[in-house]
Amino acid sequence: MTARASTLSLMDVLLPRATLVQNILLIFSGSLLVALCAQISFYLPFSPVPVTGQTFALLLVGATFGARRAAAALLLYLAQGAIGLPVFAPGGLPGLARFAGPTAGYLLAYPLAAFLLGWLTERLSRRAWLLAVLAAEAVIFAGGVSWLKVWAQLTWPQAAAQGLLPFLPGDLLKVVLVGACLPASWWALEKRRPTRER
């Protein structure tokens, strides 16, 4: 494998000359994956923010699609929710009203987190995937906790207690799952590629 290939996203290597149609399909599939994973959700009794599978899907899309496709997929996901499609986690406000609710900060941070994760994976060694994923998680929690503090008129410790600390164990599991998927995906891709392209 060439040195340049190590700085490309998984999809860039899989589709080195992706057409416009292929890129559109990838972006749509990324938004669909996030929407499907969002349906896996439950609420904790002491927080207005649900535990969902959204962030797992975001991390997977960000780590494999590259910065621009990942950000576009998450922007499309937010647009789908804004017009009323049932893509957000169940139980919250519908449509645009969701962006005035307790989870708005997390949602609005999604495209930035996806872009950052994609940007880092395009530039860092694959062994540095943990750093890239943690940076994306930090962006999500920064947006989410900051908005929750304002929305619920909480102190910073209260906002962290409701919007950060309860979710750390679950998000650690998501990081581990993404970390398990990435090496396996790269290994499978490299097994398929001719030796002369490596």
Residue map of PLM features:
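Juxtamembrane/transmembrane-helix boundary motifs in multi-pass membrane proteins
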Residues: 14-18, 22, 46, 89, ...
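Membrane-embedded alpha-helical hairpins and interfacial helices in multi-pass inner-membrane proteins
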Residues: 124-197
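Peri-membrane helix termini and adjoining interfacial loops of integral membrane proteins
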Residues: 2-8, 82-90, 152-158
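Hydrophobic transmembrane alpha-helices
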Residues: 2-73
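Alpha-helical transmembrane segments in multi-pass membrane proteins
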Residues: 26-37, 58, 62, 73-81, ...
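Short helix-perturbing small/polar motifs within transmembrane alpha-helices
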Residues: 2-15, 22, 36, 94-142, ...
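Alpha-helical membrane segments and adjacent membrane-interface helices in multi-pass membrane proteins
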Residues: 41-116
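Structural signal for the C-terminal ends of transmembrane alpha-helices
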Residues: 64-68, 116-124, 184-190
